[in-house]
Amino acid sequence: MKSARRKNILRGIRQSLNRFISILFIVALGAGFLAGLSATSPDMFENADKYMDEYRMYDIDVKATLGLTNSDVDAIAQIDGVALVQPARVLDMVLVNEHDNELTTRVFALLDNDGATDLNQFELKEGRLPETIDECVIQSSAGRYTLNAPQIGDTLTLAESSNDSASEYASSNTLRVVGIVESPMCISVEREPSTAGTGSVALQAFVRNEFLTMDFYTDCYLLVQDAVQLDTFSDEYTAFIDDMTAKLETLGDKRASLRADELREQGKQEIDSAQAFMNSFESVIGTRTELAEDAAMRAKQTAAAAALINSNPELAQKLVATAKAVGDALSSASDDKENAQARIERLNADIADAQNALDGIGDGTWLVRTRADSVGYANYKDNVEKVSALCKVFPMFFFLVALLVALTTMTRLIEERRTQIGTLKALGYTDWQIFGEYILYSLSAAVLGCAIGFLGGFKLFPTVINSAYGMMYTLPPMDAPFRPDIALLVAPVTIGGILLATVWACYSVCRSRPAQLMQPKAPAPGKRIFLEHIPTLWKRMSFTQKVTCRNLFRYKKRLFMTIIGMAGCSALMLTGFGLRDSIDDIVYKQFGEIDLYQMSIVLNDANAIDNDTELKALLTSDMPCSVKSRFRSR
C-alpha cells in the first residue's frame, strides 16, 4: 500500500511538474528574500565589528581641553578594566595640495619608528609606511569626493590660512604622501566636523609621532578588557562601555583640575621671569643713559683746553679721538634708548596678554568619547537599522504572493483530480490518507524551495546590499555566513503557510460525498452583473468583453487572488521607484529650496558687522549676490 501511494505521489509530480516547479520557485524566492534581508543587518553589523576588532580600533577616546600629560595617561592605564592605552597627538590643519586646493586635514601622529601602532591600526592599500617625519599616509576615502585628491608622491604644504597651533607644533611645513590606507576610524565618506579651515575634515593623514612637537597629548585611546567579545553595535556593548566611561569621567574631574593648577603655576613662573627680565633691562638702560650723559659733560670740558690743543699736536690727536668716541657713544645711547623703550612697551604688552591668558584658564574638562560618537559609526548604524526596518515589511509581500500561488495551484490540482479522489473515498480511504498525498506534494516543494532560497538568499542579498553601501563606507568584503537561527525561524513560517494553503484547498473537497466527487463538477452559476443594468454600456460591449466581465464575478476567489497579487507586485515596484526618486531629489531640495546660498561665513562676534567698517562695506557693496546675516556663538 505504501509503495503504491509513493508511486502515485511521484507520478503526480511528474504529471504536474510545471505546477510543482512554480510552487518550488515561488517558495525559494519568498524564503530567500525573507531570510536574506533578515540576515543583512546582522551581517553588516558583524562585518563592521570584525573589521574594528581586527585592526584594534579604540573603544574609548579621551580628550582634554587643556591637554593630557604622562601622569594622566598613567592614571588612565591604572583603572581596573583598561586593557591597553595609547596616547596620541591629533591636530587639524589646512594643507594645500599641488593643485592649490586647500584641504582641511586631520593629522594623527601615532606611528612609531617602524610605522606601526598598537591601537587604531590600518590596512596599507598602496605605497609604503612613513619613514621620516615629513612623510604621511592618507585615508583612501579622500579620493572619492575630494577635488584633486592627493596621490602617492604628492606634496602637501601648510597653508598660510592654517591655525596658529599648526604653525607652532608642526615640525615640518610639508608632508609627502607615500601611501594610501584604510582605517576603521574613518569608514565613512561623511566628513567629521573640524575647527580648522572649512569646518569639515576633507582628508585624514597618519604621520610619525615626532611630526607634532607639543609637550602634551591631545587624545588617549584605550581598549576595554573583554569588550572585544561583544558586538560593537549591541546594547550589551554599549552598557559595558558606559560603565568604563563613568569611571573615566570621574577620574577626569580630578585630573583636569590638577592640570589647570599646573598650567597656572607654569604661567605664573613664566610671567614672573619675564617681569624680572624687563626690570633688569630697564635698569641697564637707565645706567647706560647716565653714562652717556656724563661723557657728554666731559666732552664739553674739552673746549676749555683749545689753547693747549693748538700748542701740543700729540695731545690734540688724542683728544680728537676721544671726542669722536664720545660722539659715537652719545648717538648710540640715544638710539638704544629709543629701541629699548619700544622693546619695553612690547614686553609690557606681552606680559599683559600672558596674564589675561593665565586668568582665562578654566578648570578644564575631559571629553570621553566612544565609537558611537564618531560620525562614521553613527551613520553606519543608522543606515543598517533602516535596512532592518525595510526587511520587516518587504518580505511580507513575497510571502503573501507565495501563499496565493500555492493556494491557486493546489486548488486547481485538486479540482482536476476530483474523480480520483472520489474513487479513493469510495474504496474506503480516509480523508487524511487521500489528502496526505497533496500535503506531501506541497511539503516537498516547500522544503526544496526553502533549501534553494536559503542557499541563495543568505549569500546574495546581504552581499548586494553591502556592495551598494560600499560607495559610502570603506569596509572589507562581507562573508555573509549561513544563519541557522534565521533559517529555523523562516522555514517553519514558510512551510507552515504553504501547508495551510494546501489544507484550505482540500477542505472544500473533503465535505463532498464520493458520488459527487466522481461526477464532473458543475460550473459556477452565472449571475447578472451590475453592468447589465446599464443597457447603453452593455449593448456596446463585445461578446468576449461580456464573458470576461461575468467571469470576474463568477470566480471570486481567482479575482481576489489576482488583485492581491498584482497589488503586492505593483506596491513593490512603486516603492522601489519612489525610493529612487526620493533619493535623487534630496540634493536638489537641500541646495535648491532649503539652503539657498553658495557660501557661509561664521563670525565670532554678533556685532562684528557694526564694529568692522571694512567688513560692513564689503557686505553692503554692489556685489552680484544677496547677503543675509545670521549669527551663532562659538
What does each of the following model-derived ranges do?
Residues 22-33, 388-408, 442-453, 486-490, ...:
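Alpha-helical transmembrane segments of integral membrane proteins
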Residues 543-634:
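Juxtamembrane segments of multi-pass membrane proteins
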